[in-house]
Amino acid sequence: MATIQQQKIRIRLKAFDRRLLDTSCEKIVDTANRTGATALGPIPLPTKRRIYCVLRSPHVDKDSREHFETRTHRRIIDIYQPSSKTIDALMKLDLPAGVDIEVKL
């Protein structure tokens, strides 16, 4: 039994701002659909919360503390049957600086 290997590009996106992440996902999906590839997603992954506990006072008041948190929002987009035109369009795509992108072929 021979299985046909299907070409796929997996794009993982991370950002602190959810709206910035969603607009970047829309741009990627629109670009993939315009070039003839099929895009599956964006698939939301669990949001990571990182909480930092800091003393409010520089001196002895250990009971007075302040909490800060960062939330990292993540998405996955799978692009099936990408052509060379699709890859060129994705490389030329201008995305905001606050979005971290990881691409796997």
From Swiss-Prot:
One of the protein's GO biological processes: translation
UniProt protein name: Small ribosomal subunit protein uS10
Domain of life of the organism encoding this protein: Bacteria
Gene field: rpsJ
Cellular component annotations (GO), alphabetically ordered: ribonucleoprotein complex; ribosome
Tagged with keyword Ribonucleoprotein: yes
GO molecular function, a single term: tRNA binding
PROSITE patterns: RIBOSOMAL_S10
Subunit structure comment from the entry: Part of the 30S ribosomal subunit.
